[in-house]
Amino acid sequence: LERWKSRFSGDAMGWLQVLGEVEALSSFANLHFNFRDWAFPEIEEESGVFRAEALGHFLIPPEDRISNDFLAEGRGTILVITGPNMAGKSTFLKALGVNLVLGLAGSPVCARSCRLSPFKLYTSMKVSDSLDKHLSLFYAELQRLKVILEVILRGEDVFYLLDEMLKGTNALDRQAGALALMRQLVGFKASGVVATHDLELTRLEEELPEKIKNFHFDGFVEGDQLRFDYILKPGKCESFNALALMRKIGIKI
């Protein structure tokens, strides 16, 4: 036994790596077996391509899932998504992120078809403060954005997802910072999606129409009930529901 250990112990890490790859590939094969309608993505040689038909979040049951087409092509492209609370903005960003990770790992994705460039995915979503690290919410957001910006400035092919960025500060500073960051990002080959309630950001489509496109999710009020169709539509959102939600819980507005 000692002779065997002496001879082969140096190979143990290689064996574990192969076993890990087999487990990962087995998991992907299991996904394909159980979800035959999922597509294997085609990997693009050119940078900046993320195209999908009927893309959805796989953790939502098929009977409840609303899928959407998505297209982001070209360096510096930013899709700005607006919409009322609970309309599906954050869930859609999560769907983009998880499917991008799955697809580039070699797995089928929850979509009818998909084409991807070999992006590196970076996100600023659900950022929180930290008592242990003495970080306020706003500074934690800045630290996350700093990491993303540094990678982009190095010229790497990045796809980013920014959900309600800079929400930890006042409205004026948030708008100024978000507008400045987006104007900076379009100058690099990274592309991504920004979800926001701030309609001021949608004006960038007029300023940079070849780089920035507006999309939105809708919400509807029927009687005292809120309704959502979770369908991604072109253009900026024209209706919001925050006041209706406040009234619903008893705030007299």
Predicted regions and their residues:
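Long, non-coiled-coil amphipathic alpha-helical linker/lever segments
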Residues: 1-26, 128, 132, 144
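ATPase nucleotide-binding head domains, primarily ABC-like/P-loop NTPase cores
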Residues: 28, 35-253
